A protein has these predicted regions:
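Catalytic/RNA-binding core of pseudouridine synthases
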Residues: 1-230
Length: 230
């Protein structure tokens, strides 16, 4: 493989590692492999630290394809906790509010999910990498500044309920969506539509375009993968 000329590397990002952290580590290993100080490397779509799954890295001239990969359809599996919310819409922050759930049934969930399929408007999380006057929204939030983000048009191709436990009020979904979709925001909006609350307890990106997570390199085995290359 010619990393300096350009390659596409798909890795399975682990839990609690930022996309930039994963990129920096892989870039270091690749640069060491080819014997240069720094191989040009970029990623094609951020995954939250608490999310796992497909992260596409491009090196050299292949970084020009990053936008192309960002346009590809993505598939996720996610688990939601109903009846509560957190400021980040996931488990990065503690629960800040609780809501009734006794009215929530499988039938109601199925009915609500259909309303999110197609072209919809979605407001990104305040704890996100969206820019506000040049600053990242999450950086402003951590400084105690109020952040108001505008709703953006997104497209959801498929939204399936794969599991619902009425005892724990946990539900799992499979989502196929276009660029710019925040699954954390989708969780928040599903909670609102159920006249309750919801936040993510697990998120995994299982596909980007034709690249599936089963075909990705395990992050912990990247050095072994590089060692096997000639």
């Amino acid at each position: 493989m010619d990393f300096q000329s350009g390659e596409v590397i798909a890795i399975d990002k682990p839990y609690r590692l930022s996309s930039f952290g994963a990129l920096a580590h892989v870039r270091y290993l690749i640069s060491k492999k080819v014997g240069v100080k720094r191989v040009k490397t970029g990623h094609a779509g951020t995954l939250d630290p608490l999310a796992t799954g497909v992260l596409i890295l491009c090196t050299g001239k292949m970084t020009k394809r990053i936008e192309e990969f960002q346009q590809h359809t993505k598939e996720y599996t996610a688990t939601l906790q109903l009846g509560a919310t957190t400021p980040s819409y996931d488990m990065e922050h503690e629960v800040d509010q609780t809501f009734p759930t006794s009215h929530i049934t499988r039938e109601l969930i199925l009915e609500v999910l259909t309303t999110f399929v197609g072209d919809i408007m979605q407001t990104p999380p305040a704890y996100s990498a969206c820019k506000v006057n040049g600053d990242r929204a999450y950086e402003l939030m951590r400084k105690g500044r109020e952040v108001e983000l505008k709703a953006k048009p997104i497209h959801i191709d498929e939204l399936d309920l794969t599991h619902f436990d009425a005892a724990t009020m946990q539900m799992s979904i499979r989502v196929v969506c276009g660029k710019g979709t925040y699954i954390r925001s989708l969780a928040r909006d599903i909670g609102l539509a159920l006249h309750s609350g919801a936040y993510l307890t697990a998120l995994r990106r299982t596909r980007v375009g034709d690249i599936r997570v089963e075909d990705c390199i395990d992050y912990d085995h990247i050095q072994k993968w590089l060692d096997a290359l000639r």
